[in-house]
Amino acid sequence: MSGMVALRLPRGLWTAALTVMLVVLGAPVAEGRDSPQDFVFQFKGECYFYNGTQRVRGVARYIYNQEEHLRFDSDVGEFRAVTPLGRPEADSWNSQKDVLEQMRAEVDRVCKHNYQIEEGTTLQRRVQPTVTISPSKAEALNHHNLLVCAVTDFYPSQVKVQWFRNGQEETAGVVSTPLIRNGDWTYQVLVMLEMNLQRGDVYTCRVEHSSLQNPILVEWRAQSESAQSKMLSGVGGFVLGLIFLGLGLFIRHRSQKGLVR
């Protein structure tokens, strides 16, 4: 299992490195080319964790006008030029042993330190998903349809969604949307199953997530047209009854007010 969290960069070597790079890139000539009046310099510090902090990798990326040109990877142990623009800086910094030693030490000083800070909040955060099933169109027996299993509002992003028909896993005709970010540190995904409705079929959406002790199982049953008609008739009769009840109460209330007068 691996994870990545953003670095909180302390004042020190990496901040100083930014200043040096800005001075170099702001010079009139860089690698034999005129430097534009306006340019964008970016620095990205990344920490990768494998099995907690048993193995930690730190990567520093230097980006000029949206193109990475220089990189320090703790697994490599030295600076490497990604483009010709980064070669002079890589050669210069690799010749300074004190710089290399400090960069190698950043893995412990920054990555492992920040992991301990984030572990109790971001890394251990769990939000259980909500799972619902709905057909993409009105049910019709012996016709193709699409069942949509909506898995929403979960964190972290890793989730496993499976479709079953009468207890047997369905793999053909399964399509999933990309993972969707909700913008509040939760995610959602839609997993669709193309099927031919048959009376009595039972479809199950099974969801596994790290926030759950047991998988969530949501069932959906195909209904016959007569059953749907009966259900709609029952709902219609219930609504009509409520209307007449309300009308009767209203008339009675008006009559009582007339008697009081």
Curated annotation (Swiss-Prot):
Residues 221-230 are annotated as: Connecting peptide. The keyword Signal applies. It is found in: Membrane. Coiled coil: none annotated. GO terms for biological process: adaptive immune response; antigen processing and presentation of exogenous peptide antigen via MHC class II; peptide antigen assembly with MHC class II protein complex; positive regulation of immune response; positive regulation of T cell activation. Residues 129-233 form the Ig-like C1-type domain. Residues 252-261 are cytoplasmic. Keywords: Adaptive immunity, Disulfide bond, Glycoprotein, Immunity, Membrane, MHC II, Signal, Transmembrane, Transmembrane helix. Glycans are attached at residue 51. Disulfide bonds join 47-111, 149-205. Residues 32-126 are annotated as: Beta-1. PROSITE patterns: IG_LIKE, IG_MHC. GO terms for molecular function: MHC class II protein complex binding; peptide antigen binding. It comes from the Eukaryota. It is a single-pass type I membrane protein. The chain crosses the membrane at residues 231-251. Pfam families: C1-set (PF07654), MHC_II_beta (PF00969). Belongs to the MHC class II family. PANTHER family: HLA CLASS II HISTOCOMPATIBILITY ANTIGEN, DQ BETA 1 CHAIN, MHC CLASS II-RELATED. This is SLA class II histocompatibility antigen, DQ haplotype C beta chain. It comes from Sus scrofa (Pig).
